[in-house]
Amino acid sequence: FGYHNLQRFTSVVNDHLQPWWFFGPVMVVAALPFTPFLILGLARVPRWRVPPEHSLQQFAACWLVAVLLLFTAAATKLPSYWLPATPAAALLMALATTRRDRWQRWAWVASIGLVACLAVIFWLSPVWVGWIRDPEMPSLAPDLLGSGLVWRAALWFSFAAVLSSVVLIQR
């Protein structure tokens, strides 16, 4: 166990070489569609000393940055290495919703926009699913369209975009 982890940290294993900035886009995509709240949560981390009972945001930011720095330093990089940081990201996103101001409203509008974009992407799946060509899964594209999963995703993302827009307007 230790040898295998040390090997992945110090040398590239299975051609999983990625640039040093690899986990930046992974963090952005992993937080979708609430990426604006993650950005807002990170921007609102107090840069000064706060009492321990109010330090959850600093703790979550340190946790997220520690995982980011640790796996950025590793030679082998995979998107799944980001998983230990997801609870910290969730805390930062949740804490970003606690203070009502124009930045929070911006984050809501941007998140709803991302949900709407995802709905459009799923509705357009007949256009892009055919581009998926993987020799190990030759029937993935027709199977994916035939399963109805992308249509259900399109429907649910559309529903979420409309419902959250109505709620935001009524606030």
Predicted feature residues:
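Residue-level signal for the membrane-embedded core of alpha-helical transmembrane segments
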Residues: 32-37, 88
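Membrane-interface loop-to-helix entry segments
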Residues: 24, 28-31
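Generic alpha-helical segment signature
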Residues: 2, 17, 35, 58-62
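Juxtamembrane membrane-water interface segments that cap and precede transmembrane helices
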Residues: 1-23, 132-148
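Membrane-embedded architecture of ER/inner-membrane glycosylation machinery
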Residues: 44-171
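Terminal, non-globular segments
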Residues: 39-43
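Generic structural signal for secondary-structure transition and capping sites
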Residues: 5-6, 29, 47
